[in-house]
Amino acid sequence: PVEYMYVFIFALFLRPAASAQVANLRSYMRDVLVAAVITAIVSAVFVACYKFINNFGDLLLANEIARDMNAANVMADNAQFLIVIGFYVMLMFIVDRIKDRPVQFGLCVFLLLFFANNQLFDPTRHSRMYAERSFFGLTTVALFQAGDDYVIRMIHGITTHGQQSQNPEKKLHPTAYYAPLKLFIKSIDRSVSHSPYAVMGLGAGTLACVGHKSQHVDFFEIDPVVIHMAENTKYFTYLKDCPTKSTVILGDGRLKIAEAKDHKYSFIVMDAFTSDAIPTHLITREALATYRQKITKNGFIAFNISNRHIDLRYVLAKLARNAGMNAILLHDDGTSDPLYFSSTWVVLTHDDHFYTKLSKYVTDSMYIKDLNELNTSSTSLWSDNFTNILETLKVLRNFREN
C-alpha cells in the first residue's frame, strides 16, 4: 500500500494538463520552495499541538484527574482529532488554491496522506512504549486497558500479535486469540500430550504458556524485530517465565519446520496470518504434506484464521479433504473474559474422534462446526503452483451465498 501512495504522488508531479504552468526550472524550484515552506510551517504547528495534547494526557494520568487510563486517552484522542481535522481543512484550502501547480500540489497531498496514515489510523499513539520497523513492516509495543486489567500488546500494522496482562495473577494466562487452544490440547491423546509442539509466528510468545512443564516448544519467526520484542522482559515475560522450555528459530516457518524430525510434534499452531497479508505458501497442498510429516499420528494442526477480510474455511476444508484429514472449525466470540478476543480457528487432524472430544469442552461463548460438511466443489485446491486469494474475500463469499 505504501508503494501505491508513492506512485500516486509521483503521478501528481507529472500531470500533463498542468505542465504549462511550470515551463522552466525556476518555476519548479519556486514551487518546491513554496511547498517546503508550507510543509515546514504546518508540520511545526502540528507537532507542537501534538506534543501539547500528549503532555496533557500524561498530566491527567499523573495527577489522577482521570483515574481511568482510557478516559484520559479518549480526551486526548478527541482533542488531537480536532487538531488534525483543523489542519486538514487548512491543507485542503491550500491544495485547492494550488491545484494547477503540480509540485506544490503533489507535496501538499503527500503531507496530507502522511498525517492521515500516521495520526488518524495509529491506535497506539498515546500508549506506545516502543516501535521498530523491519522489512516486514512496523511493529509496536503499547499499553492498553482491558476491563479492570492493563495489558501490553504487540501490534503489527493494525493486527495484535499477542498481549500480556500486567496483573500478576494473570500474567502467564494465554489471552487474546488463544483461548480455544486450551480446548484443542485437552482433546489430544494423552500418549502424545507431553511431546514437543511447534508454533509458526512468535508474536509476544504467549503460546509458551499452553504447554506442560515437561514439554518443549519450537517457535518459528521470520521477523527479527518480533523476536527482539518478545525476548525483551521489559515488555513480555512469556518466554522467560512460562514453564514450557522454548526455542526461537529465525527464518521462514515452512522451510525451517521441514528440517525437523518426522513426527516430532504433538501439534503445530499456524499463527502467521494477519489482516494485511496472507502468506499463502503456508497453506498449500505441499505445505500441508510437510506439516503432516512432522506431527504424531493423532496430533493436530491448528490454523488461526481470524481475519476481517479473508475467509480461509473453504480453502482449509478442501486441503483437508484432499489429504484425508478431518477439518473442524471453532469460533470464540471472546465475551467470556475481557482479556480474550473474538477468534476463529480451524483444526486439521487424522483423529476421527477429535470432534467428539472437543465438543465436550465447548463453552457458551463458542461455536463448533465440522467443516467436512462444507461444499468445496467450487473452491480451488491451493498448491505451490496456484492460489486464488480472490475466492477467500469475505465480501465476495457473502455476495455469492446471498
Task: Place the predicted regions along the sequence by residue.
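Alpha-helical transmembrane segments of multi-pass membrane proteins
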Residues: 1-365, 377, 384-402
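Extracellular/surface-exposed low-complexity segments
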Residues: 370-371, 375
